[in-house]
């Protein structure tokens, strides 16, 4: 089957924002104006197409990323039909994994900001994730009709808080209840959308006389940005010659693709104004897969069992290249089972083809391929370079796996996922629930790499861990609704970590057992040292054995014995991070030595060394931002101080003050209720994981004592 839409007319984009910035409402308008939906679904009615989960409809928030495909030919039908693959991502920090894995496979992003709230904490988190993958982006300042809306203040915040060069290509015509349209700074025309047909029709008009000076000033900034990195256009500009619309747009596009600037549009999605112009900007300024081929993909060849890195040279515009794709999400569908979402980077694949999972080193056969529209499926026969689709029936694939042609084995750059910071115990109510719970938790863990399940070795309880209270609340709710599991839920527990502050040398571990017959003998000597800076994931094992004093076949058993101890630290049973181990001496017995003996000897050496190396407990520190009316500022700050918070600063807002602080997670349980009480329900807050830091001595002692009692 021949390609219908050229790759140059593809736009793979993500839509991201802080919670309540109007992200899903904007996506719903996109689906309406592009003809996918014939009726607008509203978030507040629980009818948004992209928020299809029951929990999303009940809470009015996005929980899981949803994908869809649509086509756009321009407000004035000025383009050839462009295929836009959209992933709508969550705004709540507890579901940041959805943003992370979406940005890994997207070519461009639309960042949405509230014209009242401006650049909020999750906006900054998402910005860092987009930066991580070098994704070009444009911005849409939404809710221009809201009381307190201030377009220019948000542009200023983007410069100050995100450290970027924002370049408006539109400015609003008035704001709040008087917001009526936008001024196109390239055409220098006003655009008004018709309220009667929900903004489907529009007209260009002259710029209102009271806005001509302001428009000229922002137009000047736009032109200066367009010519900044183009010598030809700069000469033309300096000699007073007029730049064409094509020259301006082409230069701005190149700067967007190079991540030098962020173009700003504006409107009110709820009032059906500005989203159509945003779609035009997506087509005109964001990249096609061809534009990002040179830096978005890291290719690793595998030959003779050795990995060899090479520069990215896949031709993303050529369907005849070997098939390469990345699985970026696993979802459980009640009707078809596992759905594997994947992005095709080169070549093509058809249903029934055999592909190779180069991470798992397994061949699998593609069953059915479907195009997703939120939770609806449209079966298709094949997908090609640039496509985003889902496969039914792949059994061994997990998030981050590379899928490729068995005759052209490559591995794409892996995806990194955050470690959980909060845990709760779950206990099935009945024997039947116990069997179902195991299946449910395993499936949910396969879907979400930031969700972990383990059994506490002391209490034998099932412990689930995630990114926050809401994250775990949703997991438990899904377990109940989708899998019919009844469970009792424990109190939230903080995921502490253990590490060391000092180095110790020549610590011996010896395991000898003689009880008739063949004995056991393992003997190791290790050095233990801390890794800096604290990154909560580091472990290094250095094998410095010389002359075969410990045979090579036992080295991996020694490493494994130490790694098993890292799961349950000697201090309080929490996982151990940021340590290095050097194995440099030991001995063995010709008859009695075995892998198990050396594994046990290594664990004994590690425990002994750890206790001598000035061990400390690390606690998760959260970045907290509270927005409150000014009259409650003192109460809010006082309460944060009582929670061992460290105030970082304050920012003036139209509604009052924004207070930024670092607070231990253990002190933030129940904060939502307390801050509402202190401010008569008028404050709001957001919280996200920032770092691990050494817990104060009295806090660590209390935690260790409580663990010992239990």
Swiss-Prot record:
GO terms for biological process: ribosome disassembly. Signal peptide: none annotated. One of its GO terms (molecular function) is guanosine tetraphosphate binding. CDD domains: EF-G, EFG_III, EFG_mtEFG1_IV, EFG_mtEFG_C, EFG_mtEFG_II. InterPro entries: EFG_II, EFG_III, EFG_III/V, EFG_IV, EFG_V, EFG_V-like, EFTu-like_2, G_TR_CS. Residues 8-290 form the tr-type G domain. Its main location: cytoplasm. Disulfide bonds: none annotated. Keywords: Cytoplasm, Elongation factor, GTP-binding, Nucleotide-binding, Protein biosynthesis. GTP binds at residues 17-24, 88-92, 142-145. GO terms for cellular component: cytoplasm. It is found in: Cytoplasm. HAMAP family: EF_G_EF_2_B (MF_00054_B). PANTHER family: RIBOSOME-RELEASING FACTOR 2, MITOCHONDRIAL (PTHR43261:SF1), TRANSLATION ELONGATION FACTOR G-RELATED (PTHR43261). Catalyzes the GTP-dependent ribosomal translocation step during translation elongation. During this step, the ribosome changes from the pre-translocational (PRE) to the post-translocational (POST) state as the newly formed A-site-bound peptidyl-tRNA and P-site-bound deacylated tRNA move to the P and E sites, respectively. Catalyzes the coordinated movement of the two tRNA molecules, the mRNA and conformational changes in the ribosome. Belongs to the TRAFAC class translation factor GTPase superfamily. Classic translation factor GTPase family. EF-G/EF-2 subfamily. This is Elongation factor G.
